[in-house]
Amino acid sequence: MTFVEPIITHAPNEKVMAKQWLHGYQYGPLWVPPLIGPGTLANLFLAYTAQSQMQRIAYIVAALSIFSILPITFFYMEPGINGATKWKVQMLLKDEGFGMKDTTVWYPSAHRQGGTLASRRWAERTGMKELILFWRRVNNWRWGIAFLAAVASGWATFSEVA
């Protein structure tokens, strides 16, 4: 479902795996927020203009679902698996001069390090492949949330078509 499979299947070593994962991971902020913002606002507008209570509820569920991806990312994934995986990338590529500045929850960035000390320690004792596979598993939950939002919004849109 993500760019992960070719990386874990074909990367010849952990360094290459780390570079490929980071490159793919850093594309996320280019397209995820531009989908979440308008998707949330559009569903809120549709809820406001909905003709039935059921439509309104479905649009609100869709808006809240799609918006929930941001706090999940910033408050759960960034200090956890995102931070751990970026820390592992730093560890593997430090001999090439690669490093990331630290970030805070108020300034999230795919180009900065936001992992907690616990997630960094976890990364130090875990292989790159295992981290990437866990990242994919957590990331797939966000895809599931987006699917739920699409189903709720789609149902609300087509429920009154007759």
Predicted regions and their residues:
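Juxtamembrane boundary at the C-terminal end of a transmembrane helix
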Residues: 154-162
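Hydrophobic alpha-helical transmembrane segments of polytopic
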Residues: 32-39, 58, 62-65, 142-145, ...
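Individual transmembrane alpha-helices with interfacial aromatic-anchor signatures
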Residues: 123-148
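Interfacial segments of alpha-helical transmembrane regions
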Residues: 49-69
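Interfacial loop at the N-terminal end of multi-pass membrane proteins
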Residues: 1-42, 85-104, 121-124, 131
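Intrinsically disordered, low-complexity cytosolic loops and termini enriched
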Residues: 104-113
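Hydrophobic alpha-helical membrane-embedded segments
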Residues: 1-2, 64-82
